[in-house]
Amino acid sequence: MKAAVHFLALAALMATGSTFASCDRNSDVSTESNVPVLDVKSEVTSFALGANLTGALPPSPPATPSEADMLTYMKEEEKLAKDVYTTLNAKWNVQIFTNIANAEATHINAVVGLMEHLGLSNTALLPVGEFQNPEFTILYNQLVAQGSISLAEAYKVGALIEDKDIFDVSTDMQNTSNASILLVFDNLKRASGNHLRAFTKQLTALGTTYTPQFIDQTTYAQIIATPMEQGKQYRKINGQ
């Protein structure tokens, strides 16, 4: 399992200073409909769950050991985002943290659904601020402390989390050929990009900026310059 050490170090340093991609379906177009799985509203990007997500996932082999580690880590990373945003909302009472925390809950459920689809059972979630990987517990405490300094620092914490999510998902997508993982992770990446745009917009309104710590500056600039991503719709056979 990948370490969160670099993420932890950056947090300490700071403290000191829609829809899914298409799946090919060989069926008559007259029997199909466009089905959204990634739901983009304003600055918040959620997964439409249940039958929509299940229908989008293609048949896939069971997860390999490395893919199991990848998914377990991503489940914890998405939970970190939700837990930090929930706690920072209690501190600052600003709508963006409420909205994005709710969106992150759907991201967690999407990863859990993916894990179950691939035959994994370690899908349990601990209470807010508690994680199976103790490094995430340490990181949660550091990020909450940093985000409690000021509203600007809270938005920078949000940007850092989304920055790391984009980097990790992009890396993971290069290390798997599993179609279901690629489908979900592509849209986690889109969602994190949308949330990074949202936090950057809030920072700009406060007259400050965020410097990316994981993705490179060129990638960050491209994300910020791009409109909110809606993704592609997949085709679902009516009645299924």
List PLM regions with ranges.
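Bacterial Sec-dependent N-terminal signal peptides
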Residues: 1-7, 13-57
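All-alpha RGS (Regulator of G-protein Signaling) helical domain and cognate RGS-like helical scaffolds
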Residues: 36-240
